[in-house]
């Protein structure tokens, strides 16, 4: 509301997107899906926004992607090289299921000062690009310890 008021009064403000990280099963592997730019309070996302974990069908990646799309958002595979299955396999499956993109640039070493992991990020970026998917960058910084991240 505050940003809208500032914008209405002629103040230049940044564009802020809604965002949420949702756990999902992709090829039997628990992954994180970033929901970006969705309609806040959309009923399709309520099961994922209650504070408790979903089970069964709502946990499947295709259900998560469908809910995000129903809410007008983009579904992005977060940090694809952090999981027990290979990033190439997960990205292929994500593309097949209708994901909109993947997190290409990420600090896999979790350094004290954020820096993308060049070799793996370049491979992921190229694969996402070849599949026509959006490519994002993320810090994966949760909480108040943001210094350097």
List PLM regions with ranges.
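Structural recognition of alpha->loop->beta junctions
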Residues: 91-110, 149
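Histidine/acidic-residue-rich catalytic or RNA/ligand-binding cores of hydrolases
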Residues: 28-33, 85-92, 112-123, 144-149
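Active-site metal-binding loops of divalent metal-dependent hydrolases
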Residues: 21-22, 80, 106, 139-141
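A short, flexible low-complexity segment enriched in Lys/Arg and Gly/Pro that occurs
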Residues: 46-49, 102-123
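Short acidic, glycine/proline-enriched helix-loop-strand junctions
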Residues: 2-16, 112-137
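Extended substrate/RNA-proximal surfaces in nucleic-acid metabolism proteins
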Residues: 2-98
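Short acidic/histidine-rich active-site segments
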Residues: 132-148
